Curated annotation (Swiss-Prot):
GO terms for biological process: cysteinyl-tRNA aminoacylation. It is found in: Cytoplasm. Pfam families: CysS_C, DALR_2, tRNA-synt_1e. Belongs to the class-I aminoacyl-tRNA synthetase family. Its cofactor is Zn(2+). GO terms for molecular function: ATP binding; cysteine-tRNA ligase activity; zinc ion binding. This is Cysteine--tRNA ligase. A motif ('HIGH' region) lies at residues 31-41. Binds 1 zinc ion per subunit. The gene is cysS. A motif ('KMSKS' region) lies at residues 266-270.
Amino acid sequence: MSLRVYNTMTGRKEEFEPLQPGKVGMYVCGVTVYDYCHIGHARANVVFDIIYRYLQFIGFDVTYVRNYTDVDDKIIKRANERGISSDTLAGEFIQAFDEDMNRLGLAEPTIQPKATCHIDHIVNLVQRLIDRGIAYESQGDVYFSVEDFPSYLKLSKRNMDEMRSGARITPGEQKRNPMDFALWKAAKPGEPSWESPWGPGRPGWHIECSAMSMEYLGESFDIHGGGKDLVFPHHENEIAQSEGATGKPFVKYWLHNGFVNVNQEKMSKSLGNFFTIRDILQTYDPEVLRFFILTAHYRSPIDFSDQNLQDARLGLSRFYEGLHAASEVLAACPPGDVTSEAGATLENVFREAMDDDFNTAAAIGHLFDAVRTINRLITEKGFRKNREKVAQVRALYDALLKLGGVLGLFVSDPAAWLKQMNLAMLATTGYTESDIEDFIRQRQEARKNKDFARADEIRDELAAKGIQLLDGPQGTAWKAR
Protein backbone atom coordinates (compact mmCIF):
# COMPACT_ATOMS: atom_id res chain seq x y z
CA MET A 1 0.00 0.00 0.00
CA SER A 2 1.36 3.42 -0.91
CA LEU A 3 0.87 6.52 1.21
CA ARG A 4 -2.51 8.19 0.81
CA VAL A 5 -3.32 11.59 2.31
CA TYR A 6 -6.57 13.50 2.71
CA ASN A 7 -6.37 16.68 0.64
CA THR A 8 -8.63 19.47 1.91
CA MET A 9 -8.59 21.01 -1.57
CA THR A 10 -10.20 17.98 -3.24
CA GLY A 11 -12.06 16.63 -0.21
CA ARG A 12 -10.73 13.10 -0.66
CA LYS A 13 -7.78 10.82 0.00
CA GLU A 14 -5.17 10.83 -2.74
CA GLU A 15 -2.05 8.83 -3.42
CA PHE A 16 0.91 10.89 -2.30
CA GLU A 17 3.23 11.71 -5.18
CA PRO A 18 5.61 14.60 -4.49
CA LEU A 19 6.50 17.07 -7.22
CA GLN A 20 10.10 15.84 -7.16
CA PRO A 21 10.58 12.08 -6.69
CA GLY A 22 12.11 11.31 -3.31
CA LYS A 23 11.87 14.89 -2.02
CA VAL A 24 9.12 16.60 -0.03
CA GLY A 25 8.66 20.28 0.71
CA MET A 26 6.34 20.92 3.67
CA TYR A 27 5.27 24.23 5.18
CA VAL A 28 3.28 24.49 8.40
CA CYS A 29 1.97 27.75 9.80
CA GLY A 30 3.65 28.46 13.10
CA VAL A 31 2.41 30.44 16.07
CA THR A 32 1.84 34.14 16.49
CA VAL A 33 4.23 34.76 19.36
CA TYR A 34 2.31 36.96 21.79
CA ASP A 35 1.35 34.46 24.52
CA TYR A 36 2.05 30.96 25.82
CA CYS A 37 0.92 28.09 23.60
CA HIS A 38 -2.27 26.21 24.40
CA ILE A 39 -3.41 22.62 23.88
CA GLY A 40 -4.57 23.41 20.33
CA HIS A 41 -1.04 24.49 19.42
CA ALA A 42 0.28 21.30 21.00
CA ARG A 43 -1.97 19.19 18.80
CA ALA A 44 -1.10 20.93 15.55
CA ASN A 45 2.62 20.79 16.18
CA VAL A 46 2.66 17.17 17.36
CA VAL A 47 0.57 16.12 14.33
CA PHE A 48 2.89 17.68 11.79
CA ASP A 49 5.93 16.48 13.71
CA ILE A 50 4.63 12.93 13.20
CA ILE A 51 4.00 13.56 9.51
CA TYR A 52 7.54 14.93 9.18
CA ARG A 53 9.00 11.92 11.00
CA TYR A 54 6.98 9.37 9.06
CA LEU A 55 7.84 10.85 5.67
CA GLN A 56 11.50 10.58 6.62
CA PHE A 57 10.99 7.05 7.94
CA ILE A 58 9.64 5.84 4.59
CA GLY A 59 12.57 7.35 2.74
CA PHE A 60 11.72 10.90 1.72
CA ASP A 61 14.18 13.76 1.95
CA VAL A 62 11.96 16.32 3.69
CA THR A 63 12.44 20.06 3.91
CA TYR A 64 10.14 21.12 6.73
CA VAL A 65 9.53 24.85 7.19
CA ARG A 66 7.61 26.12 10.22
CA ASN A 67 7.54 29.87 10.70
CA TYR A 68 7.22 32.32 13.55
CA THR A 69 4.74 35.16 13.04
CA ASP A 70 6.62 37.83 14.96
CA VAL A 71 4.79 40.95 13.74
CA ASP A 72 1.01 41.10 14.06
CA ASP A 73 -1.82 43.16 15.55
CA LYS A 74 -1.97 40.91 18.64
CA ILE A 75 1.77 41.21 19.26
CA ILE A 76 1.67 44.99 18.93
CA LYS A 77 -1.34 45.28 21.27
CA ARG A 78 0.21 43.04 23.95
CA ALA A 79 3.61 44.77 23.71
CA ASN A 80 1.99 48.20 24.10
CA GLU A 81 0.01 46.96 27.12
CA ARG A 82 3.24 45.80 28.75
CA GLY A 83 5.22 48.85 27.72
CA ILE A 84 7.85 46.90 25.80
CA SER A 85 8.82 46.64 22.14
CA SER A 86 7.20 44.13 19.81
CA ASP A 87 10.64 42.60 19.23
CA THR A 88 11.13 42.01 22.95
CA LEU A 89 7.70 40.44 23.37
CA ALA A 90 8.12 38.23 20.30
CA GLY A 91 11.57 37.10 21.46
CA GLU A 92 10.18 36.15 24.87
CA PHE A 93 7.43 33.98 23.42
CA ILE A 94 9.60 32.45 20.69
CA GLN A 95 11.80 31.16 23.49
CA ALA A 96 8.75 29.92 25.41
CA PHE A 97 7.40 28.17 22.30
CA ASP A 98 10.73 26.46 21.66
CA GLU A 99 10.87 25.28 25.27
CA ASP A 100 7.35 23.85 25.06
CA MET A 101 8.05 22.04 21.78
CA ASN A 102 11.30 20.60 23.14
CA ARG A 103 9.46 19.25 26.17
CA LEU A 104 6.92 17.61 23.86
CA GLY A 105 9.77 15.89 22.03
CA LEU A 106 9.33 17.55 18.65
CA ALA A 107 12.00 17.12 16.01
CA GLU A 108 13.40 20.46 14.93
CA PRO A 109 12.12 21.63 11.53
CA THR A 110 14.63 22.16 8.75
CA ILE A 111 14.01 25.91 8.72
CA GLN A 112 12.22 28.18 11.23
CA PRO A 113 11.98 31.61 9.60
CA LYS A 114 10.72 34.80 11.24
CA ALA A 115 8.45 37.14 9.31
CA THR A 116 10.47 40.20 10.30
CA CYS A 117 13.57 38.70 8.66
CA HIS A 118 11.75 38.49 5.32
CA ILE A 119 10.40 41.99 4.80
CA ASP A 120 12.23 42.36 1.47
CA HIS A 121 10.67 39.12 0.18
CA ILE A 122 7.26 40.28 1.33
CA VAL A 123 7.60 43.70 -0.31
CA ASN A 124 8.71 42.08 -3.58
CA LEU A 125 5.73 39.72 -3.52
CA VAL A 126 3.30 42.58 -2.89
CA GLN A 127 4.83 44.50 -5.80
CA ARG A 128 4.40 41.49 -8.10
CA LEU A 129 0.70 41.41 -7.23
CA ILE A 130 0.33 45.12 -7.96
CA ASP A 131 2.17 44.67 -11.26
CA ARG A 132 -0.24 41.88 -12.25
CA GLY A 133 -3.24 44.09 -11.51
CA ILE A 134 -4.68 42.06 -8.64
CA ALA A 135 -3.58 44.31 -5.79
CA TYR A 136 -3.92 48.05 -5.29
CA GLU A 137 -2.49 50.76 -3.05
CA SER A 138 -4.78 53.03 -1.04
CA GLN A 139 -3.35 55.72 1.26
CA GLY A 140 -0.27 53.65 2.14
CA ASP A 141 -2.18 50.38 2.54
CA VAL A 142 -2.09 47.67 -0.13
CA TYR A 143 -5.04 45.33 -0.63
CA PHE A 144 -5.58 42.14 -2.61
CA SER A 145 -8.52 42.39 -5.00
CA VAL A 146 -10.45 39.15 -4.61
CA GLU A 147 -12.66 39.88 -7.63
CA ASP A 148 -9.55 39.71 -9.80
CA PHE A 149 -8.77 36.17 -8.62
CA PRO A 150 -11.66 34.08 -10.01
CA SER A 151 -10.88 30.91 -8.05
CA TYR A 152 -10.96 32.64 -4.65
CA LEU A 153 -12.61 30.41 -1.99
CA LYS A 154 -11.72 27.19 -3.84
CA LEU A 155 -10.12 25.72 -0.70
CA SER A 156 -12.87 26.55 1.80
CA LYS A 157 -15.70 26.01 -0.73
CA ARG A 158 -17.51 29.09 0.57
CA ASN A 159 -19.99 31.10 -1.47
CA MET A 160 -18.69 34.48 -2.59
CA ASP A 161 -22.10 36.18 -2.65
CA GLU A 162 -22.86 35.04 0.90
CA MET A 163 -19.41 36.10 2.08
CA ARG A 164 -19.72 39.49 0.42
CA SER A 165 -23.13 40.17 1.96
CA GLY A 166 -21.75 39.56 5.44
CA ALA A 167 -18.47 41.45 5.01
CA ARG A 168 -17.92 44.92 6.45
CA ILE A 169 -15.29 47.57 5.95
CA THR A 170 -13.60 48.67 9.17
CA PRO A 171 -13.55 52.46 9.65
CA GLY A 172 -10.31 53.84 8.23
CA GLU A 173 -9.91 51.11 5.61
CA GLN A 174 -9.96 52.23 1.99
CA LYS A 175 -10.99 48.96 0.34
CA ARG A 176 -12.77 48.70 -2.98
CA ASN A 177 -14.54 45.54 -1.84
CA PRO A 178 -15.33 44.44 1.74
CA MET A 179 -13.79 41.02 0.94
CA ASP A 180 -10.42 42.47 -0.09
CA PHE A 181 -7.68 41.83 2.46
CA ALA A 182 -4.55 43.70 3.49
CA LEU A 183 -1.16 42.80 2.04
CA TRP A 184 0.61 45.83 3.53
CA LYS A 185 -0.55 48.13 6.33
CA ALA A 186 0.51 51.77 6.51
CA ALA A 187 2.48 52.73 9.61
CA LYS A 188 0.61 53.94 12.69
CA PRO A 189 2.01 55.61 15.81
CA GLY A 190 3.34 53.07 18.31
CA GLU A 191 3.71 50.30 15.73
CA PRO A 192 6.86 48.82 14.17
CA SER A 193 7.31 49.71 10.51
CA TRP A 194 9.59 49.18 7.53
CA GLU A 195 10.18 51.22 4.40
CA SER A 196 8.34 50.21 1.23
CA PRO A 197 7.39 51.70 -2.16
CA TRP A 198 4.05 52.67 -0.57
CA GLY A 199 5.58 54.37 2.45
CA PRO A 200 6.49 52.99 5.89
CA GLY A 201 4.34 50.13 7.10
CA ARG A 202 4.24 46.45 7.99
CA PRO A 203 3.05 43.26 6.31
CA GLY A 204 -0.38 41.70 6.63
CA TRP A 205 -0.53 38.28 8.25
CA HIS A 206 -1.36 36.23 5.14
CA ILE A 207 1.39 37.60 2.89
CA GLU A 208 4.06 36.62 5.42
CA CYS A 209 3.43 32.90 4.98
CA SER A 210 3.26 33.14 1.19
CA ALA A 211 6.60 34.91 1.07
CA MET A 212 8.38 32.61 3.52
CA SER A 213 7.05 29.35 2.11
CA MET A 214 7.96 30.23 -1.48
CA GLU A 215 11.37 31.56 -0.43
CA TYR A 216 12.40 28.18 0.98
CA LEU A 217 10.26 25.68 -0.94
CA GLY A 218 9.72 27.33 -4.31
CA GLU A 219 6.62 28.69 -6.00
CA SER A 220 4.98 25.24 -5.98
CA PHE A 221 5.53 22.68 -3.22
CA ASP A 222 4.04 19.50 -1.82
CA ILE A 223 2.38 19.93 1.58
CA HIS A 224 0.92 22.89 3.41
CA GLY A 225 -0.44 22.17 6.87
CA GLY A 226 -2.18 23.77 9.81
CA GLY A 227 -5.29 23.61 11.94
CA LYS A 228 -8.77 23.56 10.40
CA ASP A 229 -9.30 27.07 11.76
CA LEU A 230 -6.73 28.32 9.22
CA VAL A 231 -8.58 27.10 6.11
CA PHE A 232 -10.37 30.44 5.93
CA PRO A 233 -9.24 33.12 5.72
CA HIS A 234 -5.53 32.41 6.15
CA HIS A 235 -4.88 29.53 3.76
CA GLU A 236 -7.48 30.73 1.29
CA ASN A 237 -5.69 34.08 1.14
CA GLU A 238 -2.28 32.44 0.85
CA ILE A 239 -3.48 30.61 -2.25
CA ALA A 240 -4.86 33.80 -3.78
CA GLN A 241 -1.65 35.77 -3.13
CA SER A 242 0.75 33.05 -4.21
CA GLU A 243 -1.06 31.86 -7.32
CA GLY A 244 -2.01 35.42 -8.18
CA ALA A 245 1.67 36.38 -8.19
CA THR A 246 3.13 33.31 -9.91
CA GLY A 247 0.33 31.95 -12.09
CA LYS A 248 1.32 28.47 -10.83
CA PRO A 249 -0.39 25.98 -8.51
CA PHE A 250 0.78 26.89 -5.02
CA VAL A 251 0.43 23.64 -3.04
CA LYS A 252 -0.35 20.09 -4.11
CA TYR A 253 -1.71 18.70 -0.81
CA TRP A 254 -3.47 20.71 1.90
CA LEU A 255 -3.54 18.93 5.29
CA HIS A 256 -5.51 20.21 8.29
CA ASN A 257 -5.75 18.84 11.81
CA GLY A 258 -9.01 18.82 13.77
CA PHE A 259 -10.06 20.97 16.70
CA VAL A 260 -9.47 20.39 20.40
CA ASN A 261 -12.53 20.53 22.64
CA VAL A 262 -12.33 20.72 26.43
CA ASN A 263 -14.80 18.49 28.28
CA GLN A 264 -16.85 18.39 25.05
CA GLU A 265 -17.00 22.18 24.76
CA LYS A 266 -15.06 24.49 22.47
CA MET A 267 -11.92 25.75 24.18
CA SER A 268 -12.36 29.42 25.06
CA LYS A 269 -10.92 31.87 27.57
CA SER A 270 -14.44 33.21 28.16
CA LEU A 271 -15.61 29.72 29.21
CA GLY A 272 -12.69 29.37 31.58
CA ASN A 273 -11.54 26.14 29.91
CA PHE A 274 -8.40 27.50 28.27
CA PHE A 275 -5.24 25.50 29.08
CA THR A 276 -1.68 26.30 28.10
CA ILE A 277 0.84 23.55 27.46
CA ARG A 278 2.64 24.73 30.59
CA ASP A 279 -0.52 24.36 32.67
CA ILE A 280 -0.92 20.77 31.52
CA LEU A 281 2.71 19.78 32.00
CA GLN A 282 2.56 20.79 35.65
CA THR A 283 0.41 17.69 36.16
CA TYR A 284 1.15 15.37 33.25
CA ASP A 285 4.35 14.06 31.72
CA PRO A 286 5.01 15.52 28.24
CA GLU A 287 5.01 12.07 26.67
CA VAL A 288 1.54 11.44 28.11
CA LEU A 289 0.24 14.55 26.36
CA ARG A 290 1.91 13.49 23.12
CA PHE A 291 0.44 9.97 23.44
CA PHE A 292 -3.03 11.41 24.12
CA ILE A 293 -2.86 13.51 20.94
CA LEU A 294 -1.81 10.51 18.84
CA THR A 295 -4.57 8.21 20.05
CA ALA A 296 -7.03 10.05 17.78
CA HIS A 297 -6.84 10.47 14.01
CA TYR A 298 -5.36 13.88 13.28
CA ARG A 299 -8.42 15.09 11.31
CA SER A 300 -10.91 14.13 14.02
CA PRO A 301 -11.87 16.43 16.89
CA ILE A 302 -10.26 15.43 20.16
CA ASP A 303 -11.71 15.98 23.63
CA PHE A 304 -9.28 17.20 26.26
CA SER A 305 -10.20 16.26 29.82
CA ASP A 306 -8.50 15.02 32.97
CA GLN A 307 -10.11 11.62 32.50
CA ASN A 308 -8.82 11.29 28.93
CA LEU A 309 -5.33 12.31 30.00
CA GLN A 310 -5.43 9.81 32.87
CA ASP A 311 -6.47 7.14 30.38
CA ALA A 312 -3.55 8.16 28.16
CA ARG A 313 -1.17 7.91 31.11
CA LEU A 314 -2.48 4.43 31.88
CA GLY A 315 -2.11 3.37 28.24
CA LEU A 316 1.44 4.67 27.97
CA SER A 317 2.29 3.01 31.29
CA ARG A 318 1.20 -0.35 29.85
CA PHE A 319 3.66 0.10 27.01
CA TYR A 320 6.49 0.95 29.37
CA GLU A 321 5.58 -1.93 31.70
CA GLY A 322 5.70 -4.35 28.77
CA LEU A 323 8.99 -2.94 27.51
CA HIS A 324 10.49 -3.08 31.01
CA ALA A 325 9.39 -6.67 31.56
CA ALA A 326 10.70 -7.71 28.14
CA SER A 327 14.07 -6.01 28.64
CA GLU A 328 14.59 -7.79 31.98
CA VAL A 329 13.67 -11.19 30.56
CA LEU A 330 15.73 -10.73 27.39
CA ALA A 331 18.76 -9.67 29.43
CA ALA A 332 18.75 -13.17 30.91
CA CYS A 333 18.35 -14.83 27.50
CA PRO A 334 21.48 -14.61 25.33
CA PRO A 335 20.74 -14.07 21.63
CA GLY A 336 20.52 -17.37 19.80
CA ASP A 337 20.68 -18.41 16.17
CA VAL A 338 16.89 -18.45 15.81
CA THR A 339 15.25 -15.46 14.11
CA SER A 340 11.65 -14.27 14.00
CA GLU A 341 9.59 -12.39 11.44
CA ALA A 342 7.35 -10.94 14.17
CA GLY A 343 9.09 -7.56 14.07
CA ALA A 344 8.81 -7.27 10.30
CA THR A 345 5.14 -8.26 10.46
CA LEU A 346 4.51 -5.58 13.09
CA GLU A 347 6.27 -2.98 10.96
CA ASN A 348 4.15 -3.93 7.96
CA VAL A 349 0.82 -3.42 9.74
CA PHE A 350 2.15 -0.23 11.37
CA ARG A 351 3.03 1.13 7.95
CA GLU A 352 -0.34 0.13 6.52
CA ALA A 353 -2.02 2.22 9.22
CA MET A 354 0.27 5.20 8.75
CA ASP A 355 -0.02 4.99 4.97
CA ASP A 356 -3.77 5.46 5.42
CA ASP A 357 -3.57 9.24 5.95
CA PHE A 358 -1.23 8.98 8.97
CA ASN A 359 -3.66 6.96 11.09
CA THR A 360 -1.74 7.06 14.37
CA ALA A 361 -4.70 5.67 16.32
CA ALA A 362 -4.65 2.45 14.28
CA ALA A 363 -0.85 2.32 14.36
CA ILE A 364 -0.83 2.54 18.16
CA GLY A 365 -3.45 -0.21 18.25
CA HIS A 366 -1.04 -2.53 16.42
CA LEU A 367 1.72 -1.63 18.87
CA PHE A 368 -0.63 -2.47 21.75
CA ASP A 369 -1.22 -5.89 20.19
CA ALA A 370 2.55 -6.45 20.19
CA VAL A 371 2.83 -5.55 23.89
CA ARG A 372 0.00 -7.95 24.72
CA THR A 373 1.80 -10.70 22.81
CA ILE A 374 5.04 -9.97 24.68
CA ASN A 375 3.28 -10.07 28.06
CA ARG A 376 1.62 -13.37 27.19
CA LEU A 377 4.79 -15.05 25.94
CA ILE A 378 7.14 -14.05 28.75
CA THR A 379 4.74 -15.38 31.39
CA GLU A 380 4.37 -18.78 29.71
CA LYS A 381 5.95 -21.71 31.51
CA GLY A 382 9.30 -22.65 30.00
CA PHE A 383 9.56 -19.43 27.98
CA ARG A 384 13.29 -18.89 28.50
CA LYS A 385 14.10 -22.32 27.12
CA ASN A 386 11.96 -21.83 24.01
CA ARG A 387 14.32 -20.26 21.49
CA GLU A 388 11.55 -19.49 18.98
CA LYS A 389 9.48 -17.58 21.53
CA VAL A 390 12.52 -15.73 22.88
CA ALA A 391 13.37 -14.69 19.31
CA GLN A 392 9.77 -13.56 18.77
CA VAL A 393 9.81 -11.39 21.90
CA ARG A 394 13.20 -9.93 20.99
CA ALA A 395 11.95 -9.05 17.50
CA LEU A 396 8.78 -7.44 18.84
CA TYR A 397 10.73 -5.53 21.50
CA ASP A 398 13.16 -4.11 18.93
CA ALA A 399 10.31 -3.22 16.55
CA LEU A 400 8.37 -1.47 19.31
CA LEU A 401 11.32 0.78 20.08
CA LYS A 402 11.91 1.48 16.39
CA LEU A 403 8.29 2.23 15.51
CA GLY A 404 7.64 4.07 18.74
CA GLY A 405 10.52 6.32 17.76
CA VAL A 406 8.66 7.21 14.56
CA LEU A 407 5.86 8.49 16.79
CA GLY A 408 8.25 10.13 19.23
CA LEU A 409 7.24 7.59 21.92
CA PHE A 410 9.04 5.12 24.21
CA VAL A 411 12.13 7.34 24.25
CA SER A 412 12.77 7.05 28.01
CA ASP A 413 14.33 4.21 29.98
CA PRO A 414 11.29 2.10 30.96
CA ALA A 415 12.36 1.55 34.58
CA ALA A 416 13.12 5.24 35.11
CA TRP A 417 9.88 6.34 33.43
CA LEU A 418 7.74 3.95 35.46
CA LYS A 419 9.37 5.05 38.70
CA GLN A 420 8.80 8.70 37.81
CA MET A 421 5.13 7.98 37.06
CA ASN A 422 4.74 6.00 40.27
CA LEU A 423 6.18 8.83 42.35
CA ALA A 424 4.04 11.41 40.55
CA MET A 425 0.89 9.39 41.18
CA LEU A 426 1.95 8.65 44.76
CA ALA A 427 2.22 12.37 45.45
CA THR A 428 -1.53 12.70 44.85
CA THR A 429 -2.32 10.16 47.62
CA GLY A 430 -0.62 11.99 50.48
CA TYR A 431 1.81 9.10 50.99
CA THR A 432 5.57 9.15 50.47
CA GLU A 433 7.74 6.38 49.09
CA SER A 434 9.02 5.64 52.60
CA ASP A 435 5.41 5.36 53.80
CA ILE A 436 4.73 2.66 51.21
CA GLU A 437 7.91 0.79 52.11
CA ASP A 438 6.84 0.91 55.76
CA PHE A 439 3.41 -0.50 54.86
CA ILE A 440 5.11 -3.30 52.90
CA ARG A 441 7.30 -4.16 55.92
CA GLN A 442 4.24 -4.18 58.19
CA ARG A 443 2.41 -6.45 55.78
CA GLN A 444 5.37 -8.82 55.51
CA GLU A 445 5.55 -8.98 59.30
CA ALA A 446 1.81 -9.67 59.54
CA ARG A 447 2.07 -12.48 57.00
CA LYS A 448 5.09 -13.90 58.80
CA ASN A 449 2.99 -13.97 61.99
CA LYS A 450 0.07 -15.50 60.05
CA ASP A 451 -2.02 -12.39 60.73
CA PHE A 452 -3.54 -12.54 57.27
CA ALA A 453 -6.45 -10.29 58.21
CA ARG A 454 -4.02 -7.45 58.99
CA ALA A 455 -2.03 -8.17 55.82
CA ASP A 456 -5.22 -7.96 53.74
CA GLU A 457 -6.26 -4.81 55.57
CA ILE A 458 -2.99 -3.09 54.62
CA ARG A 459 -3.34 -4.22 51.00
CA ASP A 460 -6.95 -3.01 50.82
CA GLU A 461 -6.14 0.31 52.49
CA LEU A 462 -3.47 1.01 49.88
CA ALA A 463 -5.70 -0.20 47.04
CA ALA A 464 -8.34 2.30 48.12
CA LYS A 465 -5.73 5.01 47.55
CA GLY A 466 -4.89 3.64 44.10
CA ILE A 467 -1.73 1.80 45.16
CA GLN A 468 -1.41 -1.81 44.04
CA LEU A 469 0.95 -4.22 45.80
CA LEU A 470 2.64 -6.74 43.51
CA ASP A 471 3.98 -9.88 45.16
CA GLY A 472 6.72 -11.67 43.25
CA PRO A 473 9.74 -13.95 43.71
CA GLN A 474 11.97 -10.92 44.33
CA GLY A 475 9.66 -9.52 47.02
CA THR A 476 6.79 -7.03 46.98
CA ALA A 477 6.75 -4.09 44.60
CA TRP A 478 4.12 -1.38 44.33
CA LYS A 479 2.42 0.53 41.57
CA ALA A 480 0.32 3.69 41.82
CA ARG A 481 -2.70 4.18 39.56
